[in-house]
């Protein structure tokens, strides 16, 4: 009986660990987005200084708490503001657009970068580290 109980507990522990590992991995944004260029904070700052459009796809509360100056806010979870028409109206297809959100645990910027690439934008930049890295670097915020 003890052997069966021990085996059952071991199986349950392994299953729990695998479930947690899968969840943790799923909650991490990808390192790259096909068709987009991944940039770090310094590269994002240079793009900002060069006049690139910054697209913030975070929740409205996060946006209101602070964002990159002159960034466009389109809450990805709100279909009234985040849709293909809104994305197409952002810029010409050959203008630089930087997609960002709340860092590596935020999937919104990756999904937004994917959408921009699918819509035919040619200069899509994926700022994976997002607003936290920008803020930590001491760059301007609004």
Describe each PLM feature range.
Residues 85-134:
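Catalytic cysteine-centered active loop of the rhodanese-like fold, especially the PTP/DSP P-loop
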Residues 2-65:
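Flexible, polar/low-complexity N-terminal or interdomain linker segments that lie immediately upstream
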Residues 49-87:
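N-terminal, post-signal-peptide region of Sec/Tat-exported proteins
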Residues 139-142:
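Active-site neighborhoods of enzymes that stabilize oxyanions during catalysis
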Residues 29-34, 76, 102-104, 121:
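Second-shell loop/turn segments in exported
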Residues 50-51, 93-94, 137:
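Structured helix-beta-strand junction loops
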């Amino acid at each position: 009986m003890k052997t069966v109980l021990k085996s059952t507990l071991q199986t349950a522990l392994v299953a729990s660990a695998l479930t947690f590992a899968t969840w943790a991995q799923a909650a991490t944004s990808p390192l790259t987005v096909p068709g987009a260029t991944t940039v770090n904070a310094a590269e994002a700052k240079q793009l900002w200084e060069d006049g690139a459009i910054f697209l913030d796809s975070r929740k409205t509360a996060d946006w209101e708490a602070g964002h990159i100056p002159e960034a466009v806010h389109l809450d990805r979870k709100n279909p009234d503001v985040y849709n293909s028409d809104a994305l197409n109206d952002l810029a010409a297809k050959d203008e630089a657009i930087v997609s960002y959100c709340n860092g590596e645990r935020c999937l919104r910027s990756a999904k937004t970068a994917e959408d921009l690439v699918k819509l035919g934008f040619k200069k899509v930049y994926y700022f994976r580290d997002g607003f936290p890295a920008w803020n930590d670097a001491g760059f301007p915020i609004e």
